[in-house]
Amino acid sequence: MSNNNDLHHPARRDFLTTAGGVGGALAIGASGVASMTLGGPMAMASALATSRYGMGPGLKGPYLDLSTGKGNQLAYARIQGDLDFGKPKYFWFKGYLMGVEPHKKVVDLMGTSGFGVIRLAQGPDGAIRRMCREIIVYTDLRSGEVLDEWKNPLTNEMVKAVHVDNDPFNYLIEEFFPAPPKFGGLNQGPPPPRVPFIMPWYQHGGWAEMEIHIHLAYPNALQPDKWPRESSGPIVQVSEMFAHHVKVEDLQNPKLTTLDYTGTWNRITPWLPWMLMGQRPGFCQYACFMGTTKNLDEILSRPVLDYAEKNYAKYFDAPTEWTEDRSLSSLEHYALRQKPAPVK
């Protein structure tokens, strides 16, 4: 959720960032591989569903060993999309955007709803291509209607709402952590070392759980000299935190080419540029549930879906071809599509 007013992840993005934080070390014990017994599949499922101290046999096999880069690559690819290449998969998120200012209570500002569609394809050298389109729509806290305008309670100014659409947001899923996103060349740095893609997995009974934390700081596409009312400053500081919950039985079932999950997406980001708060101290935080679905009608409200169908029709399907187009966050898209607001 690459909302860099943003960077999906959720990122939606940038799980891809670094192996240095959460996601760079494995929290798996030597719990051993469950073996097939005369009890058959039911006995296998029962054996996998045991855990102690956050560890269990469902993290070691029999299909995927999550202490290896290859095991994590296949697990993450099945969470993100479908290894039956070509099939699309929906993810969704729904929650709130909050405003955080120094020495003041946190304020709920608006609702946030969105979805994306992912299609996987074979990539080079064993990599898996993840091809995605995604949107974020902002809604009124009381009515749930999609915002066209919004009265900022922190400034009492009426502003035009600018929703988020990212097309594409592509990256490779490999046995190693990829390099962080470049965001059109703004996020530069030396290539990181090739670190095995091993995530911090935990097992709680029949559930496997994994978090991804992404922390970024890079030059702002909205520099304050050109965008005085929109810019949070010369450097963008963004963090995203994803939590995924999947059934151990599904995770270790080789017949399943995709995995349903539930979880949360949280994002800390500067004031959204269209809020016109400039470099005022503080920031925004997204707090959302997320998951997968075969039918968006089951999750998202009718006003959100109606708005998406009218304004973002192509976002109900994922890209079918891999492109080398720059995968930009909403902050870079804002700089390309919008004009600076007049200075008051």
Across the structure, where does each feature detected by a protein language model lie?
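N-terminal secretory signal peptides
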Residues: 1-11, 36-38, 42
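Cleavable N-terminal signal peptides
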Residues: 31-33, 42-43, 47
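Predominantly extracellular/secreted and cell-surface proteins with exposed
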Residues: 99-249
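Mature extracytoplasmic/lumenal regions of exported proteins
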Residues: 233, 248-267, 271-272
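Edge beta-strand at a domain terminus
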Residues: 262-344
